[in-house]
Amino acid sequence: MARSRRRSSVDEMDVGGSATSEYENCGGPSFSPLNLSRPKKSTRGRSLRSAQAWGGKQLHPERSTPLARNDCGPSSKPRRRHEVGRSNKGLGASLDRTDEDTSQCPRIRASAIRCGASTRKIVRITGECDAQQGDSRPGRSEMAGWHSPPKRRRTPSRHGNSDNERSHLPRLSSHGVVRVGGRPLTQTPLQKTIILQPKLVRKVFMPTFTVNPEMHYRRVALGEIPKFGGAGSYGEVQIFKQTGLAIKTASSRSCFEHELAVSLLTGECSLRAQASLGIGGIICLMAFSLPSKQMVFPAYDADLNAYGYRLSRSGPPSVLVTESIERAFIGLGRALVYLNTSCGLTHLDVKGGNIFVNHSHFVISDCVIGDLSLMTLNTNSMAMRAEFEIDTGEEEIKTLRLPRSASQMTFSFVIGHGLNQPISVIADFINNSGLAKSTGPIKHDVGLTIDLYALGQALLELLLVGCISPCLSVPILRTATYYYYSNKLSVDYALDLLAYRCSLYPALFPTTPLTTIYGIPWDQVEGVFESIAGAHHREAFRAHLERYRLTHRRLFASIRIPSAFTGVLELVSLLCHANEKARLSIPLLWTPRP
């Protein structure tokens, strides 16, 4: 059939272009908006009508049914012809009348219009999807008679790029890149060389630090089931044995922010003490999560209480064990001196449950002090109003401010349960004076004497439970009547505790040239009388003292300390010395042992 400047008798939809369709020029298959295939026999009539309406060629012209003349009448108005000058082998958007067939059926014409509209709609949707996927077909051009998909307004940038994008910057995905602070915790964090970086100092005592962004994580994804490690008033601890981590979850937001702030300061001090002075014994924060209120620390084999109970069941300790114990506590004493004097940090909660050890056959290889929930800033601190900028992986940087309570002494935290405090603090509690009435930051020398005395009490507890009591017929306890007072600190219990110390310590503390530099190491009865103000309190103390002389005199007189424990007990007597000057100097901590 001739195709010069006229259409065929069967109207075809025109896509425009050259003699071949643009999709025939592509390397891929020909384009079909409805994904039509070869018509089946059962749908021959419908396929024929669709081919006539969409302009497709008849596959079997001999099977086509001719239209009757009386079915369609001639059109009174000639249809407008699209002058596109392109081939009609593809899809089209208009129906044109020809001179061979001047009479067209209105039903076919209406069907063609509907099909053309459907075609334009489908192709427009397909084009938008291709544009979103970034699929650029070679040789593709705008098609005549189609409604092009809406385009965003483009203006050339100063780099000559019409996509309003900077060509010199890498193109990011629509989801963005997760920053370091927003990643989950999937493995053991690497050992940090720096935790805090000073940024600026706005005012005195108000420095601003930038926290290492690698320390923050979004959630825990370690891939193992944790074990319960313990719980307290400020949170609970879970142990991940495979990765060697201990994750503490705070019970409240205020407790978490306080402990996190002091843990950041303590961790930075720990790194500097180890690098410059070779002082260890301070637990170092490894990672934390603000949304989860969690802090990550290295896990240890046991705390000091569990270590002492296991040691008591293993028999008399060897010389290697006692030497490792002494060496570990000398390191802890140096760490507390460094924290109180150089860093301005007072722990206030030194006890066996907060000291963690790694050991092999009870020979301690590593020992640190942890649980910084009660730590306070003393008068030597220069960061009482410090701020910490934390990158959590979000758009805005979070700012953590050190709470004011972190630098304000609370006497209830200082006195605690009364088990590990020196006589000066207990006397202030009994008399309701001194530290009980003090406000503001605690003095650094007072904080140091409190921490060192508590460290000596923890060492004494370990020796009594794990070393001395197994060798005696009747075990000796460090505190005899604490549970009689329902685990609550009262004036009567404080007087009872002082009377028990005056009865027990003369039987334990050695009197050597090292321990008697500043006088007798244990508390004297006369000194306790002088420290107690009220006459009725003195009478109560005298009554408790007479009772212990009647009930515990023979037991304490039967104590025989093996010579292997003399060096460790010297350290105990210095840490728990009645004279505060002996605790502040601690010659054993800084003098190399022969």
From Swiss-Prot:
Belongs to the protein kinase superfamily. Ser/Thr protein kinase family. GO terms for molecular function: ATP binding; protein serine kinase activity; protein serine/threonine kinase activity. Keywords: ATP-binding, Host nucleus, Kinase, Nucleotide-binding, Serine/threonine-protein kinase, Transferase, Virion, Virion tegument. The lineage of its organism: Viruses, Duplodnaviria, Heunggongvirae, Peploviricota, Herviviricetes. SUPFAM superfamilies: Protein kinase-like (PK-like) (SSF56112). The keyword Zinc does not apply. It catalyses: L-seryl-[protein] + ATP = O-phospho-L-seryl-[protein] + ADP + H(+); L-threonyl-[protein] + ATP = O-phospho-L-threonyl-[protein] + ADP + H(+). ATP binds at G229, G230, A231, G232, S233, Y234, G235, E236, V237, K248. Residues 1-105, 128-183 are annotated as: Disordered. InterPro entries: Kinase-like_dom_sf (IPR011009), Prot_kinase_dom (IPR000719), Ser/Thr_kinase_AS (IPR008271). Multifunctional serine/threonine kinase that plays a role in several processes including egress of virus particles from the nucleus, modulation of the actin cytoskeleton and regulation of viral and cellular gene expression. Regulates the nuclear localization of viral envelopment factors UL34 and UL31 homologs, by phosphorylating the US3 kinase homolog, indicating a role in nuclear egress. Disrupts host nuclear lamins, including LMNA and LMNB1. Phosphorylates the viral Fc receptor composed of glycoproteins E (gE) and I (gI). It comes from Equine herpesvirus 1 (strain Ab4p). Its EC number is 2.7.11.1. GO terms for cellular component: host cell nucleus; viral tegument. Autophosphorylated. It is an enzyme of class 2 (transferase). The keyword Kinase applies. Gene3D superfamilies: Transferase(Phosphotransferase) domain 1. This is Serine/threonine-protein kinase UL13 homolog. It is found in: Virion tegument; Host nucleus.
